[in-house]
Every structure is written in C-alpha cells, then in structure tokens.
Amino acid sequence: MATVTDLPDDLVREIFSRVPLTSLRAVRSTCKKWNAISKYDILGKKAAAKNQFLEFMVTDSRVCSLRLDLQGIRSEEDLIDLSIKQISIPNKVDQVEISQVYHCDGLLLCIAKDNSSVMVWNPYLGQTKLIQPRKKLHRYDKFALGYDNNRNHKILRFLYEGSPRNVIIDVYDFSSDSWRVLDIDIDWHELFSHNSVSLKGNTYFFGRKGPRLPMLFKPPSRRFEYLTLSCVRNEKLAVLYSHLNRFGTIEICISTKIDPSAVSWTTFLRIDMTLINGLPDNFFVHSYATSFFFDEEKKVAVLFGTNRYRGRETCQYYQRACIVGDSGYFKAVNIELVFNSQLQSCQLVSSSYVPSLVQLQD
C-alpha cells in the first residue's frame, strides 16, 4: 500500500507550493522525508500569491503572527479570514520580552525589551542567532536589517548618545560575526520616523531632514498629515498618504522603478473616505494607519491602526484592520484590545511575509 513517503519529489514540491505557510508544523510532522524537504524547499509559494497574507507584529512584548485571507471578499458572502496568535521562538529565548522587531529577507531582527541583546530569527527554519551589542542598548536606538550586493546580511544600529547631534552608527556583519563603527556624522533628526521598510536589502524611511526621493505628491508640511511606508511582496515600495485627525482622501502609490537616488511612482488607489457608506464616526480619528498592505488584483488596501472607544469611566483602544477599495468598498475588523502604551508596538513589521532559507549559524 502506497504512503506519502512514496510520492515523487516533484509531486511533493507541488503539494508544498499549494499548502499555506501556516500549515508548516503539520507538514513537517507528517514524515521525516517531508520534514527534510521543507528545509530546502519553501512551503506555500503559490498559496501566498492567492490573496493570503502572513504578517508579524509585537503585542504585550511578544511576537505574534497575523494571517489574513482575502479570497472571500467582494463575493456574495464577503468573508474575511483573520487570525492572530503568539508564536514561540525556539532555543529557550521564548521568555525574552521583545520591544521592537524589524524584517528583511524573511528574517526578523528582535530587540530585547530590557536592552540586553538583539536576536535574529528565521521563523521558517526555526533558527535563531543571539548577538551581543558592542555597547549597551538604549531605548532610543534605531535599527535596520539588510544585506549587500554579495548577499551578506548586516545590522545597522544607530546609537543615541544623549544628544541629537551625537549619533554613532554600528554595523554588525553576519559573515565575520563582528561589529564595526562607521565614520559618518549624522543628525538624529535625519533618521527614520516611526516606520521603515526593507526592500531587497535596503532600508527606506521618512526623515525630517536630508535628501528626499521624489514623490508623486508633496511631502507633508502640516502636523495633521501622515505618510506610511510599506512594500509589495519584496518587489516594490508603497506609500500611504492620509490625515492624522480626519480621514478625507487617502492615496496609495507604488514604485515603478527604484534607483539609488530616484524612485518613479504611480498611483495605485485613491479613495474619498467621505463617500463610503457605513464608515464609523471614530474611524482612526484618534490615531492613524500605522501600517498597511494591499491586494493589486482585488484593488483593496488593508489599513492597520488603533481606535479609541471612550466609555463613562474608561477609555479602551482596539487594534483594527480596515479593508478599503474602489467603488466605496469598506469592511472593518477589530483584532484585539491593546493598552495605550502598546499603540506603537502593535504595527506590522513585515508586509506580505515571504519565507527565507537563509541559514543562521548559532
């Protein structure tokens, strides 16, 4: 009698490509052969291309995964399959509280809340690498994860030395397992704001000063305007333009060409939120879309932010996902209750996560 171990490797790989990434544990526990194949063949390549998104976020000082399936939207049932769960980090570091997470090339850079260490984690392979900083971490430190032209991964750390004009840049090289200091003068205000994205090894962000890449619209000059960065399946940059205290028109642009000193943009979606029927009165009124991603095929964007609900005695915040699209489409889903101190940490740290086979030797 034939079993799953008798299936040809080509057929197994085709099965792997259609199974969602969230089924990885079940696949690996099926048999030793499937477990071995999953270590050098990525699961869910075709499934991920069919309106299924896997993201990561930090909530309650723990790393959580958020899975969102948009295949059922704009249908007769108009179903949205959304789930969030805390995920375990292997190698006995699961109890470490995390304050920040950065993403690049399928890897997650996790910063310990007690500022003791940094850790790089490959969720797909289940591998981690603990890295001791050259100097003790500071809560104002900024980080970026990327790689060079030879695919050597590196960590950039911007050390806050007590003054906005006293910033040191450390670089950790995975290949040499060592830190070095860059001899560069930089003002703290030139560094990235609340969100940044990594695309093909480079990190992009909005800074208050310094050279700007061209945009389709004028960069915000008033305090109530907001720009949020994202990327499209590690292929293109995307930017969301919105208002902080009132939602009028939102605009999403995607890059068509990226050069070292120039980016070409095109408008993907422009929506007048005042024309949407059933839009809640408090829709992102007291916050903003901290992160977002979108589905090019279905012409919808998923905006993540927090909404405040004020009761007679208490005030509560909910992490919310809002799906908006052309022709007035709108649907909102409350994800979970969060505390005020967690609002910044609840933003997504990857846009349409794609697994990686990058080995972490630790």
Curated annotation (Swiss-Prot):
Q: Which residues form a coiled coil?
A: none
Pfam families with a match to the protein in the record: F-box, FBA_1
Location of the F-box domain:
1-47
What NCBIfam families does the database record attribute to this sequence?
F_box_assoc_1
- Organism equals Arabidopsis thaliana (Mouse-ear cress)
Q: What is this protein identified as?
A: F-box protein At1g54550
Report the InterPro entries cross-referenced here.
F-box-assoc_dom_typ1 (IPR006527), F-box-assoc_interact_dom (IPR017451), F-box-like_dom_sf (IPR036047), F-box_dom (IPR001810), Gal_Oxase/kelch_b-propeller (IPR011043), SCF_F-box_component (IPR050796)
